[in-house]
Amino acid sequence: MERYDPADAPIPDEWLALDEGERIDLVGRFHRGARIPLPNLLAHAAFHVAVENQLALPDQVLVRDTLQRLIREGLSRHDAIHAVASVLAVRVHELLQPGASATES
């Protein structure tokens, strides 16, 4: 896989065959090339990768169904990835709080 475009789903086997750093680099290159201003390109790319990883795994039906629903409701695939990533970011933030438990909701 030589390029990433969030408008097109990566082929799962090709995506998962990449090293995590390669995935982050591909996503970062897309955003730099598209001249999308971001406060933290690395964090943004990492959340894109986390969502794409879930979409590529066969057992992550809920994530795939959610992404498809968001697209049916009118979001672009890129914006739908952002929507899923925003939920993930909130959960990560919650888990980083003192006393948080990974088993909470």
Task: Briefly describe each language-model feature range.
Residues 1-105:
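Structure-specific DNA junction-binding interface
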